[in-house]
Amino acid sequence: MPKVMKDVVHPLGGEEPSMARAVVRSVGGFTLGLSLATAYGLLELLVEGHSPWGCLVGTLTLAAFLSLGMGFSRQVRATVLLLLPQAFSRQGRTLLLVAAFGLVLQGPCANTLRNFTRASEAVACGAELALNQTAEVLQRAKQPLVSALNKIKAIARKTKEVADRVRKFFRSIMDGVKHIARALRNVWQWLLHIGDVCNSELGNPYLKCARVFDDAKDSCMMVIPQAYHLCYVLMPFKLALCGLASLVQVFCVIPKYIQPFLRQTIGTPVIQLLNRVRQEFEFNMTATHHFSVDLNASRSLSQVAMDLHEAVSMKLHRVREALALMGFTTPLLLVLLYLQALFYRYCYLNWDHYDNIYITSRFLRMEAVRSTAGLPTVLPLSAHEARRYIPPGSIFLSQWEKFFYILETFNLIRHLLLVLFLVFLDYAVFWVLDLARHQLQGEIVARSPVLVSLTVEGTGYAGNIYRDLVSAFDVLQQGNISILSRRCLLRPSEPDSTGYIVIGVMYGLCFFITLFGSYVSRLRRVICASYYPSREQERISYLYNVLLSRRTNLLAALHRSVRRRAADQGHRSAFLVLASRCPCLGPFVSHFWLHQAYCLGCGQPQDEGDMENTVSCSTPGCQGLYCLTCFRLLDNTCSVCASPLSYQGDLDLELDSSDEEGPQLWLAAAQRKDPEQAWLLQQQLQEVLGRSLSMESTSESSDLDEEKGPQQRKHGQQPLPEAHQPVSILTSPEPHRPPETSSATKGAPTPASEPSVPLSPPSLPDPSHPPPK
């Protein structure tokens, strides 16, 4: 059938709605659009917990689209109405599972991550508390030494003050001594240099006096060289006067003899005395203490705690981002459902085989019209067709619906197990952390069990030092260590019961969709049929033609199946066929394989006690055994012995010169049914085999078979080969002309039609691609 490419198929002239109905539909669509937008806004605000402004903007946008679209557009109205049952389809259930799992991620998973974060914060606080307590213990351990050092420093400061005073006193003494020394040095220098000054000022008196008289003598001798002997008159005066001048030389010689005496007797002892006094006031004070604490760690405990907290935060950053994105699943869900509704509407208008498996009331009316007109019909359906094609209101599911029903049930169970595990994990983590909080909610402080008191008596610097040391040990004993503090108390986050109720409701809705989604999804075809009735009539005609075409091909396939199983003598397996060919395997096969009769048409096993549902061929010597359905499809004629009579056409028979049983059975059946047809069949067989055939042997075998009776013929049946569904063998239709006394189903197949709707030949769908749901 040609595909309909128009999106809108207007109804027939008699069904065109009036103006009043159009107004009512527009008002109803406008109201329904506003209601749906309001429900979406409440869902986003109350369930998802989004911001009011974001919910307001989204609700107004959706309300404008839905109300105006459903009020003034027939296509939008049909698509939105399709969206409601589309939510109960397999794709809608999948999207609802995604939304529910998003709530699970935002609820239990986020709460579990929050509890892990709080646990890491408590661990970091405990590490910092341990660091502070360790530093405090170290400070208290250093306290005795620090006190001793402080006392020593105080003594040193006081000693320094005394030393400063002694230094000032010594400096005063030194200044006085230096003043005396300077005076003595001046005297010493005067005594040291007085001889030189005396000699430089006065010279040697005797020598100077003698030099004066000598100079006078020389001058005289130069003046009066002739009377130089007169110049020697001065010599007596020289001796007398210069002898008196030598007495003054004693004063210049005395300091030379006094200076060494003063150096040895006064200078050296005084210097030694001063040095000895200086040494008495010089002293060295050395205080040495050693205190070393080695902590082999590259990082401090506070840094380790902060690094631990940052590492946990970095690990959870992407998870938190994903959880934040899960809050926008509802708009995405609505958009995808709307796109799926558009896709279903497009497929309904353009693909004849899409979701076309329902036997509707229009289909039944077409069947009644064709039955009244004497045309071939398709009802009742075969067992295989009944599993595929169902009425829309039937409580039974089609074959594909059952398959998807089982698949979706297992998928839902898998999701429920995962969600239950996440919920259990949330409660387990909270229970463990809450138990730890309950056990550690107190405060533990380590105190010294025994206090030792020491008293130091005495005065002086040493007593003060020992007294300070003892007081420092008292401080060390009285110090308390906080092992557990309320500041680091773990406060786990309690699971949200309201969120769990919402999650339970959503998964309950998923379970409802899994159970009844197939029935609700059938409303999509009802909605499209109400909006596009002419398109629905075309789809029904297409389905009727498909069934009628398969019914015609079914008869030819059933004839071939019967002939094939009759050639194999009714054996189902290759081993039984081999045993029939080799007589030596017969006892072995009969010992292990029980005898069972099978329908030659469909291969269904037949119970020996239920003979009401089986039909045996009445022709003598024929092994034909059929179920009621196959025998009705064969026009109540055995296809083994009477196929040339019931299936007119070319003799497509595999015969050779040694085949005697088949032609004799055909002639016997023809003789019983119509002697004239028996004569014609005999002529055709003689032409095919190239020899003459007589009916005498046939009549003899007929007499023998009549004596055996039908009960012995039933026990003489051999096991039949494996059943094949007749509808799975698609062949080209062959001409078939049943007798005039047959029912309407025996007539020649013609395209299904109604007086007012012309039909075209059907285009068979691909068996490997079943129609999607």
From Swiss-Prot:
Keywords: Cytoplasmic vesicle, Glycoprotein, Membrane, Transmembrane, Transmembrane helix
Gene Ontology BP annotations: fusion of sperm to egg plasma membrane involved in single fertilization; sperm-egg recognition
Compositional bias (Pro residues): 758-773
Cytoplasmic side: 1-26, 73-233, 344-415, 521-773
Bias-annotated ranges (Low complexity): 692-701
GO cellular component terms, semicolon-separated: acrosomal membrane
TM regions (residue ranges): 27-47, 52-72, 234-254, 323-343, 416-436, 500-520
Description of how the protein assembles with itself and partners: Interacts with DCST1.
Name assigned to this protein: DC-STAMP domain-containing protein 2
